C-alpha cells in the first residue's frame, strides 16, 4: 500500500469504518456527497446524524462525475467514491481520484471505498494519498474477492489524525477481529495466485454474460467488478421474483433505476444457469420453485449447500475460503 503501519486501522469488515468515517465527518452542517447509484450504507448513516445527502448522477460511462461532486456543496463534510462502484461496476481512473482529493471543499474528507478493486484491471488504489498530506481515507475488505465475508475482516487507510477521529479520539480501532480471521487474511495475502486467478475467472464470466445480454438487446453498465446492472425493460423487482422461480437469485434495484437490477458474476456453470433462466423468464416461462418450496428445500440442505442454493447474488459469499489458513 505504500503507507506506514500507523496509517492502517483494522476492523471487522469495511462496513464498520464506513459508518465511523461518515459519523465523524458529516453533520447537519456538513453534507455527504455521493454518486447515484452507489452503495447506500453511507446514505443511511449520514441521515441518522442529520446530514444533508447530495446524490450526483454518474457520467455516461458509469464513472463518478468528480467535478460535479466537488462542486455540489461548498459545505460538504465528506465525498464518497466507490471505486469500482457498487452496483454498476464502473471505475474512476487515478486522475479522477487525484482531482477529487485536490478540489474537494475545504475541511472535507474524501473516502474511497475499494471493496471491489481487486476485480479491476484499471482502477488504481488511492491508499498512497493518505500518507501524502491529503485528507483521504481508503476502505478495503476481504469480503469480496477473498471470499471472507462471514469472517469479517477489513481495514481503513488514513492519516493517524483522521483514523483517531473515526475511532472516537482513540488510537484503537472499533470492533473485534478474531485471531482466526487474521490468520485467514494473512494466508490469503501470501497466496500470489489468488487475486489474479479469481480476477480472471470473474472477468471472463462478466464479459461473456454482458456480451450475451447486449446481443439480446439488453443494455448493461460498463463494469470492472464482480457485478453489473442490466436494463431488463420491466420492473426489476418482478423480474427478480420471476428469476427466483428458476432457482436463480439476482440483486436488487436502486431508486431511479427500477428496471436495472444488479447481477453478480459467478462461475461458468452458474452464469450459464443465469442465462437459461433469463431466456425462460423473457419468454414468459416461470419455473416450478416457489418461496414455500425453496424454504422446504433449504431446511433439508447442509450449510455449505444452503449457501449455494442462493448462488447468483452476493457472489462474495460463495468464494471458497482460503484453505491454507
Task: Report residues per predicted region.
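PLP-dependent aminotransferase class I/II
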Residues: 135-214, 218-221
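Phosphate-binding glycine-rich loop
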Residues: 1-31
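Conserved PLP-binding catalytic core of the aspartate aminotransferase-like
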Residues: 202-203, 212-246, 261, 265, ...
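PLP-dependent aminotransferase-like
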Residues: 7, 24-81
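Active-site pre-lysine segment of PLP-dependent enzymes
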Residues: 47, 64-75, 87-110, 114-145
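Short beta-strands and strand-loop turn motifs
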Residues: 55-57, 78-84, 110-114, 221-223
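PLP-dependent enzyme catalytic core of the Aspartate aminotransferase-like
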Residues: 241-325
Amino acid at each position: 500500500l505504500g503507507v506506514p503501519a500507523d496509517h492502517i486501522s483494522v476492523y471487522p469488515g469495511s462496513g464498520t469504518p464506513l459508518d465511523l468515517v461518515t459519523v465523524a465527518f458529516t453533520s447537519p452542517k456538513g453534507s455527504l456527497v455521493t454518486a447515484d447509484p452507489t452503495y447506500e450504507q453511507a446514505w443511511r448513516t449520514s441521515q441518522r446524524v442529520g446530514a444533508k445527502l447530495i446524490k450526483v448522477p454518474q457520467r455516461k460511462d458509469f464513472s463518478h462525475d468528480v467535478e460535479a461532486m466537488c462542486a455540489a456543496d461548498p459545505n460538504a463534510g465528506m465525498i464518497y467514491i466507490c471505486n469500482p462502484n457498487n452496483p454498476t461496476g464502473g471505475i474512476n481512473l487515478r486522475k479522477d481520484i487525484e482531482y477529487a482529493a485536490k478540489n474537494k471543499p475545504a475541511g472535507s474528507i474524501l473516502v474511497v471505498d475499494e471493496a471491489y478493486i481487486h476485480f479491476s484491471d484499471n482502477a488504481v488504489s488511492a491508499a498512497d494519498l493518505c500518507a501524502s498530506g491529503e485528507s483521504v481515507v481508503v476502505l478495503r475488505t476481504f469480503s469480496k474477492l477473498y471470499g471472507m465475508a462471514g469472517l469479517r475482516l477489513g481495514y481503513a487507510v488514513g492519516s493517524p489524525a483522521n483514523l483517531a477521529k473515526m475511532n472516537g479520539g482513540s488510537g484503537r480501532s472499533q470492533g473485534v477481529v478474531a485471531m482466526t480471521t487474521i490468520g485467514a487474511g494473512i494466508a490469503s495475502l501470501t497466496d500470489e495466485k489468488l487475486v489474479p486467478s479469481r480476477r480472471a475467472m470473474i472477468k471472463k464470466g462478466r464479459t461473456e454474460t454482458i456480451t450475451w445480454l447486449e446481443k439480446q438487446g439488453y443494455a448493461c453498465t460498463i463494469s470492472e467488478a464482480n457485478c453489473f446492472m442490466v436494463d431488463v425493460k420491466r420492473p426489476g423487482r418482478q423480474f427478480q421474483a420471476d428469476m427466483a422461480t428458476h432457482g436463480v437469485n439476482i440483486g436488487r434495484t436502486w431508486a431511479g433505476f427500477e428496471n436495472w437490477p444488479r447481477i453478480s458474476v459467478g462461475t461458468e456453470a452458474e452464469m450459464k444457469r443465469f442465462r437459461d433462466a433469463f431466456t425462460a423468464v423473457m419468454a414468459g416461462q416461470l419455473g416450478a420453485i416457489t418461496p414455500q418450496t425453496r424454504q422446504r428445500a433449504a431446511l433439508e440442505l447442509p450449510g455449505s449447500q444452503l449457501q449455494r442454493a442462493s448462488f447468483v447474488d452476493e457472489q462474495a459469499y460463495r468464494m471458497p475460503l482460503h484453505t491454507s489458513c
